[in-house]
Amino acid sequence: MFDKLLAIIAPHYCYRCGKIGSILCSNCKKYITSRQYTSCVLCGRIVKKANLCGTHRQSYDALWCFGLRQGVIKKIIDDYKFHRVRAAAAVLADLLDSRLPTLSDDVVIVPIPTTSKNMRRRGYDHMLLIAKQLAKRRNLPYRPLLRRRNNVTQHFTKSSKERKRQARYFFEPASMIDPDKTYLIIDDIFTTGATISAAADCLKKAGAKRVEVAVIARHGKP
């Protein structure tokens, strides 16, 4: 209700063309979603379907990425995360939705949980809001099945190797895992892949047989 009222009082402008009404107008959204990201997020090889080629062994079974973290996509993500533009949740869910294939009925959407510090700063869990929107579009359940360990701090300035080593201790299961379900982890940015690998590994160790991943944007080039 508040978001609708705010949209009337202070309407958004399209981040790409400037048209009044929404963060990304229908024409610009159609244009952006038509430009599919077709590279493996780990090595940059051209792929046909998902964004992970067959040469990499990971704790997750498939990965989809909407695009690179640049231009309009970068601005939408950054404003959503750092400037409390909550309306961006629906737009980012649309971008993820456009990249994903048909999903089976046994899929459960699992957001990467934000840190307590960022929750206090933003006032919301940014990936949980996107998970709710995506679940609504796909008519699938979402569950916050991952919990961050309170004694582990994420350091973004560390080297890739150090981040991957540290990431093993990021998460623990928040509740019971059904081995008959497929779990789709969603996150906003893929950099080294350490966070999603740790999340997938956590779910697998808790009993999940199949874990897939969907991310909005790849930061930098492989």
Regions found by a protein language model. Give the residues of each.
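Glycine-rich phosphate/pyrophosphate-handling loop used in enzymes and phosphotransfer proteins
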Residues: 1-187, 191-222
